[in-house]
Design a protein with these regions (language model features):
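Σ70-family region 2.3-2.4 aromatic/basic alpha-helix that recognizes the −10 promoter
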Residues: 94, 107-110
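Residue-level recognition of short, well-ordered coil/turn positions
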Residues: 58-59, 105, 139, 158
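A generic structural motif
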Residues: 104-105, 182
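Asp-based, Mg2+/Mn2+-dependent phosphohydrolase catalytic module
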Residues: 1-5, 9, 110, 114-115, ...
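N-terminal helical cap/lid subdomain that shapes the substrate entry/recognition surface
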Residues: 2-95, 102, 114
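Structured helix-beta-strand junction loops
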Residues: 103-104, 130
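Conserved, well-ordered alpha-helix/loop/beta-strand core segments that scaffold catalytic motifs
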Residues: 99-100, 106
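Residues within well-ordered alpha helices
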Residues: 25-26, 52, 67-68, 99, ...
Length: 209
């Protein structure tokens, strides 16, 4: 098997801890029933439309906060930041990405935006320093699973899809990448994700640098 030479990573839920526990913790803090966010924002047609517009950059995070808050019955102030307040770096995947880069793999980020102000999901992660390419959906008026957004990431890396691995915690986006020629990896347990990446890239991703 020929090994891949590029690695494209989703951000939230891959280089961070999982999203769902953070959302559930927010619901508990706000006194909401469990599953309220999923129902209002990801199952409701209007909620889905709002999130897609945010990801494409056609509305701001503040506009999203103000539109989403009444659907949940909560205050709009920094709503996105409150929802994801419990997210933390997923250190094992961050370290694995760094190991891949040291081994000569080109490593890029491809993330659907949640807006950048007033709360910035990417603060403190030094994306522009640590990765060869950073593609945030709102900057391109697109969102995963749009094929054109994957093409932006590939162009920045200077690689073809069949030279790359794509990692995401959302199965729909993994499948979209696979249709383009990427080797897809669904991120669930970090240890399993890293083991799969080692097999696809042909380089060790754990241990001291």
């Amino acid at each position: 098997m020929s090994h891949r030479t590029g690695l494209v990573l989703d951000f939230g839920g891959v280089l961070t801890t999982p999203l769902l526990p953070a959302v559930l913790a927010f619901e508990q803090r706000e006194g909401l029933p469990q599953g309220a966010c999923i129902t209002a924002l990801y199952m409701d047609e209007e909620g889905v439309r709002l999130t897609h517009e945010l990801e494409r950059g056609t509305i701001s995070q503040t506009e999203w906060n103000e539109a989403a808050a009444p659907k949940l019955g909560v205050a709009p102030d920094n709503l996105m930041g409150r929802i994801f307040a419990d997210l933390r770096p997923e250190r094992s995947l961050i370290d694995a990405a760094a190991a891949a880069k040291r081994a000569g793999i080109k490593v890029g980020i491809l993330s659907n935006s949640v807006g950048l102000t007033p709360w910035n999901l990417y603060d403190g992660y030094e994306l522009d320093v640590l990765y060869d390419s950073v593609v945030i959906s709102e900057s391109h008026g697109l969102r995963k699973p749009d094929p054109e957004l994957f093409e932006v990431a590939l162009k920045q890396l200077g690689l073809a899809a069949d030279e790359c691995v794509f990692v995401d915690d959302t199965e729909e986006y993994v499948q979209a990448a696979e249709k383009l020629g990427f080797a897809g990896v669904r991120a669930q347990q970090p240890e399993q994700t890293i083991a799969r990446l080692e097999a696809l890239l042909g380089v060790p991703l754990t241990g001291a640098p």
